[in-house]
Amino acid sequence: MAKELISALCDMSENVVLCSQQYHSSEIGSIECQSSIEIPLIRESGEFYILVAKMSIRMKDIARDLGLSVVTISKVLRNHPDISDETRERVLARVKELNYQPNIAARSLVTGRTYLVGLVVPDLLHPFFAEIAKSLSEALRKSGYYLIVSSSEEDPDMEEQEINQLLGRRLDILIIASCRSTVDLFFRMERQKTPYVLIDRILPGLTANFIGVDDEAVGRLATKHLIDVGCRRVAHIRGPETSTGIRRLEGYKHALAQSKLRFADTYVITEDQGDIESKQRGAEAMRRLLSLRPRPDGVFCFNDPLAMGAINQALDAGVRIPEDIAIIGCGNLHYDDSLRVPLSSIDQHSWEIGQEAARIALGILNAKTPPKPETVILKPELVVRLSTQRRRTKQMG
């Protein structure tokens, strides 16, 4: 009878659990259940069953224990700067001791928020976007928000589908690296009062919050570096028809013009995105460049994976890097030093993009009225490694 009663009580509330042991009367005095209330014992056949109602640790419990206000506890948990280091350490120590977990559901009922942020990127496996996601997640977590990441696979239709799926989960805000060439989807989101932030890629005609690198400067910086190390026939393995690909191509052309070098269409290789990974596309592009006469002596690649494929193809064909062809990528990915030839690259500051995106997103969510759209353009940085370290022995012209 006792077991049936306990089972019924447990079924009535998710906050009621049964201690795992059965206790005899001689053992009752030593029983302790942390964060719980002991309900009167039920006796059956000389055995005692203890029904325990779990009590969720609340912020006000921590505040009472430490002699602080609930507001102070909340600020610590949201990583608010207006808290002393001593108070922060006391609160975090107590939170860890009690294994306190914020009740997101209850919080959502009060605030009307889900505390979820969506991120849509073209390629989850690309290290550039992976680092942005990691940076963004870390920054959001400090303020009690959590990140859901999705991939569009460089497909505008899939991007719209993924965005709609995320919006169906009532996310508080979206952060998007779009592969679209039209703005209709974003105009619709604005009409629906759905806040969003664009990263890496911007769309013409759209006034929106944006964080990214100066892509025209990326193209100029990479191409000028190749020219500075003696290259006179500089090719470009270009990227997709997005703002990043278009502007890096413009920077490439500008650098050639500034150095009075001729631009040749045959030296610009556009590889179909398809389902082929970037390294394979880079290898195929380099195969085409090696068949040209005169052959390029320098190659600026849209990103590091393309450059990695290009280097491998050139080396396999017996071409020396950098003596015969100097190659530079973009992204400054962490594994560049472990390549067959360490790759020179342009740092796009992916970690900073994630941090800035989080800052702007949180600013939107915490503002009483929608703030004016903010644009953050980061300055690219040249990182020189072996793939472009050539002696300047070539004659000008």
Q: What does each model-found stretch correspond to?
A:
Residues 5-8, 16-54, 97, 135-143, ...:
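Bacterial carbohydrate/catabolite-sensing allosteric modules
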Residues 14-20, 27-115, 392:
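N-terminal helix-turn-helix DNA-binding module of bacterial transcription factors
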Residues 50-58, 96-134, 142-145, 153-155, ...:
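N-terminal helix-turn-helix/winged-helix DNA-binding helices
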Residues 65, 70-75, 109-125, 225, ...:
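Short beta-strand segments enriched in small/hydrophobic residues
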Residues 106, 160-163, 186, 223, ...:
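Short hydrophobic/charged patches on amphipathic alpha-helices used for structural packing
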Residues 123-126, 153-154, 180, 239-243, ...:
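Short histidine/acidic/glycine/proline-rich micro-motifs that form metal-
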Residues 138-184:
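Central regulatory/effector-binding core of bacterial HTH transcription factors
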